[in-house]
Each structure stands twice: as C-alpha cells, then as structure tokens.
C-alpha cells in the first residue's frame, strides 16, 4: 500500500522526534489553519517545573544550520492561533527556517500571562528546546509579534537581549497601566478587564497592581535593548480603528535611544491628536506595499516606523527585515527582498 508523500513525511518527522526524545509529547493531529508539516509539541520550563505547549517545525531534510523564528501570538489568543500567525509558519516552511510558536501562558488575562516572569521563562525555554532539537543557527534567532505579541517582543528585547539577532515588533503595548486607562476611556472594557484579572485589580496610582503593571511593561526594560536590532512598527490609525494607540511605539523608542534622539512629549501628543507627522520626507519602502511609512526614525540598532495602516502587521516587511539581521552585526536598515509571501487583509489584521 502506498501512502501520500506528505503523510509519509509527517510520520517520519514524528517518529524521529519521538525516538530522539522519548518523554516528549508530540501530536500528529493537523493544526487547523497551518501547513500540514507543523507539529504540536510540549517542552519543559524549569521556572515552575511545567510542560508548555507550542507549535514547531524544522526542515528535516535540510542538513545546514537554519534561522529560528520565535513567533508570538496576540493578546487574546494562544499558541493555536492561525490567520496571520500561520503566515510565519508558511514563511519558515518555504525558506527552510525553524519555527516555534509558544503559548507563553495563553491569553493575557491570568497572573501567569501578560508579561510575567513565567512568560519570559517560557519563551527562553522554547528557544533552548529548539536549539536542542534542531540545527539552529544561533547567530540568526529572531522574534516577531503583533499586538500582545508586540508587547512580548518588546519585553524580550529588554529582558533577554543576549538571545536575539533581530526583533520585529508591531503595534505593541509598551505601558500596561497607560493602556488600561486608554482602553477604559475608549469603551474597550474587555482589555481593561483582562489587565485587572492578570494583576488582581486595577493598576491605580501607588497601588501594588500598578507596581506589577510596571514590572510587566516593556518601558521598564527597554533601556537594556540597545544592543538588539529592534524594528518597532505601528499603524497611524491604531487607537482609533484599533485598540493600541501608536503612541505606545513612540514611547518605546524613547525608552531606548539617548536623550538627543528622544521625541518630545508635546510632539507625541500632537502627532497622535492630528495624525500628521513632521514635514520630514520619508522615502518609499517597497517592502511595505500599500502600508507605506509616514514617519520613521532610526538610531543605531533601533528604528520606529509609523505606517499608513491600523492595528496590523506587514508580514513581507517584517520577515524580510529579519532575514537581513545577524547577531553581532549592526542592524541592516536596507534589507533586500529575499522571499515573497502571499497575505490578505484578513491575515495582516489578525493581531487583536
């Protein structure tokens, strides 16, 4: 009896994983919305002696060391989130990159989630597990995320800068307490309620919840992120058509760069109120397609871009930029297009 080639390939991969790691849980079930090759695995986290789930793929028929993409789900989802998240997996399969999509404690509404120490431990452990189970090129380990994943990527840039060759952050929340206030005022109570459930209450001034929110906020840690090539992106309509005002990314920029490069508070306030950037001429960036940059600043390894869009990611720009980064080298702000990726508006706007 002959079996379909794709089935044979997947079964071979599963048997290989199981034989190398007998105690490892590997699911052979298809992952809805993902390429057939993607597997569900569980990996150990020493911080609380737990096993955490993730999606994983490695190029089994590719002997050379390969880049590792750590893709991070959005605020209200988990490691099984498809849509735009599955596009990261497609890129990896097409380009022989290693892919891991950790749960990092799931939806951001529990004390264990939302930028906790366990979140950081989970992602660090996911990287270590991938290195033990695949031929990872340690000079090309990347992180990517939008919305809640953007929050996590910024947090990682400050808390684990030694890991990354490049981090692509889109529409991230840089200040948990500020976002609680903003979502409450904007009638987006479900996000404010998520924050309160994670903290145990509202992050009111001088409260323990505020202290916890500060600990979970990228702004607290981004001062240590300058060695990491970090590309911060945000749509100019976010905060109106989306849930995260683009001011979060401008404040993230300010937290990293020296005083001479910081954006004045009055400029940030006026920019958000008017949606009119400075008169600076921003060159066309072909990787952004119809979502062209409207405002851009770069300083050494850090860049911030406000683009013509909303609460979304431009996969082609993000992934081609990451492909040009290598650990120990200065950020490459003029990346070539090394590969294409077909996406729809539904994919780019999946980050909620």
Language model segments and positions:
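N-terminal cap/lid segment of alpha/beta-hydrolase-fold proteins
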Residues: 26-63
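Short substrate-entry loop that stabilizes the transition state in hydrolases
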Residues: 62-66, 71-112, 176-177, 240-242
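Mobile cap/lid helix-loop segments that gate and shape the active-site cleft of serine hydrolases
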Residues: 76-81, 165-166, 172-173, 177-223, ...
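Alpha/beta-hydrolase active-site loop
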Residues: 114-134
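Primarily recognizes the serine-hydrolase "nucleophile elbow" in alpha/beta-hydrolase
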Residues: 131-133, 138-187
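Active-site-adjacent alpha-helix of alpha/beta-hydrolase-fold enzymes
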Residues: 195, 236-299
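Short beta-strand/loop motif that positions the catalytic acidic residue
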Residues: 232-234
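Catalytic active-site module of serine/aspartate enzymes centered on a nucleophile-bearing elbow/loop
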Residues: 296-351
């Amino acid at each position: 009896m002959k079996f379909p080639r794709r089935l044979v390939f997947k079964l071979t991969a599963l048997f290989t994983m199981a034989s190398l790691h007998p105690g490892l849980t590997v699911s052979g079930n298809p992952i809805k919305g993902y390429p057939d090759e993607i597997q569900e695995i569980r990996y150990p986290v020493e911080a609380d002696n737990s096993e955490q789930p993730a999606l994983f793929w490695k190029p089994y028929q590719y002997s050379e060391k390969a880049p590792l993409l750590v893709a991070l789900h959005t605020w209200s989802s988990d490691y099984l989130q498809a849509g735009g998240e599955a596009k990261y997996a497609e890129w990896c399969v097409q380009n022989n990159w290693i892919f891991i999509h950790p749960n990092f404690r799931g939806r951001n509404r529990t004390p264990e989630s939302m930028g906790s120490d366990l979140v950081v431990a989970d992602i660090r452990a996911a990287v270590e597990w991938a290195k033990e189970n695949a031929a990872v090129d340690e000079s090309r380990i990347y992180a990517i995320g939008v919305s809640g994943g953007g929050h996590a990527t910024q947090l990682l840039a400050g808390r684990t800068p030694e890991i990354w060759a490049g981090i692509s952050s889109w529409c991230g929340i840089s200040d948990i307490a500020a976002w609680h206030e903003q979502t409450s005022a904007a009638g987006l109570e479900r996000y404010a309620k998520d924050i309160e459930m994670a903290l145990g209450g509202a992050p009111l001034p001088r409260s323990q919840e505020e202290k916890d929110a500060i600990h979970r906020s990228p702004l607290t840690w981004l001062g240590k992120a300058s060695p990491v090539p970090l590309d911060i992106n945000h749509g100019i309509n976010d905060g109106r058509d989306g849930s995260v005002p683009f001011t979060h990314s401008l404040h993230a920029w300010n937290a990293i760069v020296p005083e001479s490069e910081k954006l004045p508070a009055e400029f940030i306030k006026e920019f958000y109120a008017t949606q009119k950037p400075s008169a600076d001429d921003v060159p066309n960036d072909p990787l952004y397609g119809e979502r062209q940059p409207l405002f851009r600043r770069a300083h050494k390894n850090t860049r911030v871009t406000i683009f013509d869009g909303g609460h979304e990611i431009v996969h082609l720009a993000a992934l081609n930029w990451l492909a040009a980064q290598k650990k120990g080298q200065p950020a490459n702000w003029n990346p070539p297009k090394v590969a294409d990726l077909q996406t729809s508006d539904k994919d780019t706007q999946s980050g909620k």
